[in-house]
């Protein structure tokens, strides 16, 4: 299994590590990108409070607004992950 490769972030190291762990678990247990994203979002909503947004895929563009300190963009293998929280 590939390790996460960080591309951009505005997040604490602790929260980044939690998201990396959740994402690695999700890719090991689910095949569909939608299922991977749903797992990560549901876990973060419970552990960090709502309202999280998770986008997972091989090809997408984005332009989002996020809460300060709650944004991370990274890859695991060929999959890109965009994870952020809004108020």
From Swiss-Prot:
GO terms for biological process: microtubule-based process; mRNA transport; protein transport. GO terms for molecular function: dynein intermediate chain binding. It comes from the Eukaryota. Pfam families: Dynein_light. One of its GO terms (cellular component) is cytoplasmic dynein complex. Keywords: Cytoplasm, Cytoskeleton, Dynein, Microtubule, Motor protein, mRNA transport, Nuclear pore complex, Nucleus, Protein transport, Translocation, Transport. InterPro entries: DLC_sf, Dynein_light_1/2_CS, Dynein_light_chain_typ-1/2. CDD domains: DLC-like_DYNLL1_DYNLL2 (cd21452). It is found in: Cytoplasm, Cytoskeleton; Nucleus, Nuclear pore complex. Acts as one of several non-catalytic accessory components of the cytoplasmic dynein complex that are thought to be involved in linking dynein to cargos and to adapter proteins that regulate dynein function. Cytoplasmic dynein 1 acts as a motor for the intracellular retrograde motility of vesicles and organelles along microtubules. May play a role in changing or maintaining the spatial distribution of cytoskeletal structures. Also a component of the nuclear pore complex. Belongs to the dynein light chain family. Homodimer. Cytoplasmic dynein consists of two catalytic heavy chains (HCs) and a number of non-catalytic subunits which present intermediate chains (ICs), light intermediate chains (LICs) and light chains (LCs). Component of the nuclear pore complex (NPC). NPC constitutes the exclusive means of nucleocytoplasmic transport. NPCs allow the passive diffusion of ions and small molecules and the active, nuclear transport receptor-mediated bidirectional transport of macromolecules such as proteins, RNAs, ribonucleoparticles (RNPs), and ribosomal subunits across the nuclear envelope. This is Dynein light chain 1, cytoplasmic. It comes from Kluyveromyces lactis (strain ATCC 8585 / CBS 2359 / DSM 70799 / NBRC 1267 / NRRL Y-1140 / WM37) (Yeast).
């Amino acid at each position: 299994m590939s390790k996460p490769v960080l591309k951009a972030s505005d997040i604490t190291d602790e929260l980044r590590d939690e998201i990396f762990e959740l994402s690695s678990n999700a890719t090991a247990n689910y095949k569909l990108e939608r299922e991977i994203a749903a797992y990560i979002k549901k876990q973060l909503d419970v552990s960090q409070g709502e309202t999280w947004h998770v986008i997972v895929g091989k090809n997408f563009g984005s332009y989002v607004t996020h809460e300060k300190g709650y944004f991370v963009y990274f890859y695991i293998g060929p999959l890109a992950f965009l994870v952020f929280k809004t108020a």
